[in-house]
Amino acid sequence: MMKTLGLRILGEKNVGRLDYLLNRKSKDSWGPLNGQKIRQGVYADILKRIGFKAIVETGTYRGTTSDYFAASGLPVYTVELHPRMYGYSMQRFSKDSRVHVYQGDSPVFLRKLAADPNMPKSKVFFYLDAHVQDSSRYFKAPLVEELEIIFSAWSEAVVMVDDFEVPEMGYGFDNWGDERNLSVSCLRPLKNLKLSAFFPSVEAKLDTGARRGWIVLCREESVVKTLAGIQNLRSYVLQ
């Protein structure tokens, strides 16, 4: 009861700021990119081969992956829907000019970036992890809308999606049944975009960390050729 009262008095955003200042750590943190060494290696290789101008992340949580992205030296734009997690990350990066933290709905955030004349509109790396705000119940993932915005507004974009089903490789993914899971079937409405897809070529048992599935998406042929040469990535034909 006292905890609930405190939340009401302070507000969730301020409680999140206190979480950071009092060093209240999350018990379920695996590290950046879910602590998965294979995925981290693929990201590093992509970063080396493509001259990105910025990184955009949806689903900040406590900023572990945001901080990892910032080590690239590129500006990082990240959005978090949950007020408490936003407060935590806002406080964490309050003195870090590399990381720009926003609160709100990810498609709205992406539309604002798309309309911002100061935001690069080519060669941006996107990391999408805003699909679940409460693991105890189903929320419709904003993924399709996010991808429509990204590939309509940015050229030579590379998108990595977290928690995605990797066929027959043993990775975990967001699965709510009845075609509500994150899988290639949910990408069918985007057929007109003619996206190219890549999955990890390494089985989950050989990776580290949370062993969650992921997919990399792109559009331009030049980017497809670059990704095709990256170790531990395999091309997948979207139907």
Which residue stretches match the model-derived regions?
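A short alpha-helical cap/connector motif
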Residues: M1-F125, H131-Q239
